[in-house]
Amino acid sequence: MGRPKQGRRPLCANCDPVSDKKILIFTTGFGDGHNSAARNLKDVFEHMPGFDAEVHDTYVEVNPGASRFLQVAYNISIQRVPVTWKAFFHVFDKTPVFEATLPTLGKLKAAMRALLLEKKPAAVVTTYPVYSYLLRALMESGEVATCPHFMVVTDSIVINRVWNRAPADWDLVANEPTADAMAEAGVPREKIKVLGFPVSPRFEELAKRPLPPGPPWKILYLPSASRRTVGKVVRGLTALEGIHLTVVTGRHRHLHDFLKKLDVPMSSFSLHGWTDRMPELLAESHLFIGKAGGAIVQETLAIARPMIISHVVAGQEEGNVELLADLGAGTLATTPEAIIEAVRVAMLESGGARWKRWRENLQRVSHPAAARQTAEFIAALSA
């Protein structure tokens, strides 16, 4: 199958010049990056006069039960049986099997059609590639009016065929290596725009703050491993002189309860459960440890905090590991012993020379204002 036809779309003919221009953002819960990008863009548009943005997870709206099941299955697959997800990623990347599934998405397409007819958007943003195929089909068939379509690509460097072949007027990517990878895969270079990943608008202000003083050097750890592994990491890091550890367990209540009872003094580290203060916690830290998820990696880049990647999902997250290595902004360490040693070398050896080098490299490529700049780019072409 050839690549779907590209080309600029005319401005929406149904826009009301008196009312705010509607921006429709389509997202999904398969991974954090899609939703993060969508929410952050909406947050920016809320403060832009003349625009009104809405975020829709049409998968959930059409069939909430099935969507939740698929999200749980996705999370189990990437965490417990990653070989399954790797095989799935490979099949969709190397074969045209995805295109064969499009006729089965009739309900999803109908829901998008209803929203587009009701809202009459000045522009559409998709943060998940499936929507891009359905949107183009609706526009080309004349079922909905055409308007500019912006696709926010939430992966880096290792870009699946489903993204590369997805039709859009503009592909908005996080960095130059991703733009190069997509162009090499056949995406017209002139439709790729490097604007950075749209992280929370809060990062724009947080990035202006000075680094926290040290020592002690503040390490932020977002674990995604077993209690046994996490316990070893916490014991090892709290034993390092000159290190203060903060652990965020998120929604993993069992892990939170386990760490509260761990045989180390609670005074040696800080413990948080679910929090909406991740931007602030990153800004208050010197180094981050966590999985190579698209959203969190881009947040560490935005705030210029080096990262130790402790877990990688085969497929799309491999690109984030490659990105970090290319930038010289961190390292991969997937065992407790490797994590502890990586922290020791980076922060405590030779006056923290390695950490300082990582940080300097990040400062050259940081995009803390990416959400605002992306929204401004969309707004300018939707006017």
What are these regions (language model features)?
Residues 207, 213-284:
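Donor-nucleotide binding loops and adjacent catalytic segments primarily
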Residues 40-115, 119:
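Conserved N-terminal ligand/cofactor-binding loop architecture of enzyme catalytic domains
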Residues 12-62:
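N-terminal subdomain of nucleotide-sugar transferases
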Residues 365-383:
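C-terminal alpha-helical cap of glycosyltransferases
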Residues 140-194, 198-202:
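Active-site-proximal region of nucleotide-activated glycan assembly enzymes
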Residues 283-293:
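Acidic donor-binding loop of glycosyltransferase active sites
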Residues 331, 336, 344-365:
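Conserved donor-nucleotide binding/catalytic region of nucleotide-linked donor-dependent transferases
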Residues 297, 301-341:
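Catalytic binding pocket for nucleotide-activated donors in carbohydrate/polymer assembly enzymes
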